[in-house]
Curated annotation (Swiss-Prot):
Belongs to the WD repeat MORG1 family. PANTHER family: WD REPEAT DOMAIN-CONTAINING PROTEIN 83, WD40 REPEAT PROTEIN. It is found in: Cytoplasm. It comes from the Eukaryota. PROSITE patterns: WD_REPEATS_1, WD_REPEATS_2, WD_REPEATS_REGION. Keywords: Cytoplasm, Repeat, WD repeat. GO terms for cellular component: catalytic step 2 spliceosome; cytoplasm. InterPro entries: G-protein_beta_WD-40_rep, WD40/YVTN_repeat-like_dom_sf, WD40_repeat_CS, WD40_repeat_dom_sf, WD40_rpt, WD_repeat_MORG1. It comes from Xenopus laevis (African clawed frog). Pfam families: WD40. Molecular scaffold protein for various multimeric protein complexes. Acts as a module in the assembly of a multicomponent scaffold for the ERK pathway, linking ERK responses to specific agonists. Also involved in response to hypoxia by acting as a negative regulator of HIF1A/HIF-1-alpha. This is WD repeat domain-containing protein 83.
Amino acid sequence: MSFPAPKPKAPELPQKLQHKLECNQGAVRAVRFNVDGNYCMTCGSDKSLKLWNPHKGSLLKTYSGHGYEVLDTAGSCDNSQLCSCSSDKTVILWDVAQGQVVRKFRGHAGKVNCVQFNEEATVIISGSIDSSIRCWDCRSRRPDAIQIMDEAKDGISSVKVSAHEILAGSVDGNLRRYDLRKGEMCADYLGSPITCVSFSQDSQCLLASSLDSTLRLLDKDTGELLGEYTGHQNLSYKLDSCLSEKDTHVLSCSEDGTVCFWDLVEGSLVLKLPVGKAVVQSLSFHPTECCLLTASEGGVQVWRGASYEEEGGS
């Protein structure tokens, strides 16, 4: 006789505070894991970009070159370079080890909200309050953008890249997806200014958060609305949202000092993680592990699953 298979264990959620990073760079506008999750970057209102080992709580390097606050950053696939963008209207390509500016790209007419590398880290994609997305060639000496997407009617708040596709959210309420191979653009109107967009890990779904305190999950190919997630507060600020490392949960920052977790399939709010008293502006989920970074009150908090023990004991 065979016994019924045991029910799969519910995935752990990162709700145990492991470290706090005192960033000392004014307000932390964004925190981002690098590609393998071993390091993270923080963007400061004091114009600095910092590289950390968040698991040890140690600062590795500070990058100075922007003329105004740094708003977003991303790491290259081989960890040798960083890109960042700023209210100074520029995008900078950095050498990680040297701490030096490799290239400074100018062309946006207003502050640059978001930045990403393509998968090979040969192109930087940036989105600006000037309503345009610009693509910059990291390898050429060409000062101007190699491609400009200007379909948006208002500022670009968020861009993400997956294979040959660019996903962009705009204050005009549209979620736009550019297929670079086919040269096609699809738009889904969500009705409220979009603050953050993400691809699911399998790239089949799109997540968008809006200033109506709602997150929406859409089927990438059909645009069908698969889920709506509410219970957090997002009416005024550009806040981050994302999916967990195995696509089991939807996460969002909240203006009430928490991070909210929803079950992706059921849509139920399963955890309100109390981070602090102030707005939680940014978050980043580890690419493969149950580990979350949050940015609030001038610092970064590193969260792990309840069963996590550090090497050499808990």
